[in-house]
Design a protein with these regions (language model features):
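PLP-dependent amino-acid enzyme catalytic core
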Residues: 1-350
């Protein structure tokens, strides 16, 4: 059985992936001393800048506070975001299990960064197709195009709340299906295959279920879909690597993740889910606090609380707390830290 699985691996693709991508991202390697994290991203003490920002921007005096704040700078990763972690782990596993071979197409619904991370595969000869919303910022479209990613843009939100039956009528679903068919044809996909599944496609579009639309298109066209919203490797990348990595870096500072709270936003739930599990398993504590923008605010790639509820990896019982933060109030902080030379984005500011 193991021999058959080994024979099913595209070893040339695996070697190229490991040389050009895997060896540049954080992952576990075994040596004589055991498993260790390699290619860790910087964990930077930003306490002084944080206190200065509090005073100058928000008129809060934290000078006498014992507060200690670190920032995890995943902007140093290839393509510049934390999404490289789950993307690399999912693709590595897919190659190792024979689900991806040279020349194959990868298709995924994305609000930006995960799709951009998948763009690394283009240099390996894999075609990447992303399903995105036309509401995306132009800068995201520019980055996707720069990575040689094929784009299918829809007049729908890629991150709606799950189970939105009745929110789009049949005429809208049919019009969107026709648009998708046209774009697939331009990308040289056989439209007759699409037509054979039109009923199921229109049902998904009527619910604005773009996540499962990507899965269906991958299935009928024999492509690979990473399924970032439902793939346990998304969470596991942060449980086994990101959590251990931060803890290892804090230990080098004479501290421990056990003594810190982690603040993060919610996109797929991979980061919050993985870090929650790591801390729970190792320290039997809840330390992850999840931040949401209020309803109606559009923060790139980040869900509101209502749009997170119902997703597989939204697990509030594992969090230490949940909060809504007005992104308008976070914008001055974003500007302050960028001017200080910290390469952070909207989600970090929130």
């Amino acid at each position: 059985m193991e021999q058959n699985q080994d024979n099913n691996i595209d070893k040339v693709l695996l070697q190229r992936f490991e040389e050009e991508i895997w060896n540049k991202v954080p992952h576990l390697e075994n040596d004589k001393q055991g498993a260790k994290i390699v290619n860790a991203t910087p964990l930077v003490d930003i306490t002084n800048d944080f206190k200065e920002c509090a005073k100058k921007v928000y008129n809060l005096d934290l000078s006498n506070s014992e507060l200690q704040v670190y920032g995890k700078l995943d902007s140093t990763l290839p393509t510049g975001s934390i999404k490289v972690r789950p993307a690399a782990n999912i693709i590595h596993d897919a190659i190792m299990t024979g689900k991806i071979k040279s020349g194959q197409t990868v298709i995924e619904a994305t609000s930006g960064n995960f799709g951009i991370a998948l763009g690394m595969l283009s240099k390996l000869g894999l075609q990447v197709v992303t399903i995105v919303s036309r509401k995306l910022q132009e800068g995201v479209f520019h980055e996707l195009r720069n990575m040689n990613i094929k784009i299918m843009d829809l007049e729908m939100d890629i991150c709606p709340a799950p189970g939105m039956e009745g929110k789009k009528d049949e005429l809208v679903a049919k019009a969107t299906a026709a648009n998708i068919r046209s774009q697939l044809t331009q990308l040289e996909f056989d439209p007759s295959i699409f037509d054979n599944s039109i009923t199921e496609i229109e049902k998904l579009l009527a619910k604005q279920d773009i996540i499962n639309l990507a899965k269906l298109l991958a299935k009928i066209y024999n492509c690979f879909c990473p399924e970032q919203y439902d793939n346990d490797l998304n969470v596991n990348a942060h449980r086994t690597i990101t959590g251990s990595e931060i803890d290892q870096q804090l230990h080098e500072e004479g501290n421990s993740l056990e003594n810190f709270n982690i603040l993060c936003t919610f996109g797929t739930g991979g980061t919050s889910g993985g870090l929650s599990r790591y801390i729970s398993e190792k320290y039997n504590k809840k330390r992850v606090h999840v931040i949401f923008p209020p309803g109606g605010q559009d923060v790139a790639g980040i869900r509101t609380h209502n749009n997170a509820d119902g997703l597989k990896y939204y697990q509030p019982d594992n969090y230490a707390g949940e909060y809504e933060v007005d992104f308008e109030k976070a914008k001055p902080l974003l500007k302050f830290f960028v001017e200080k030379g910290h390469d952070i984005g909207e989600s970090s500011a929130l």
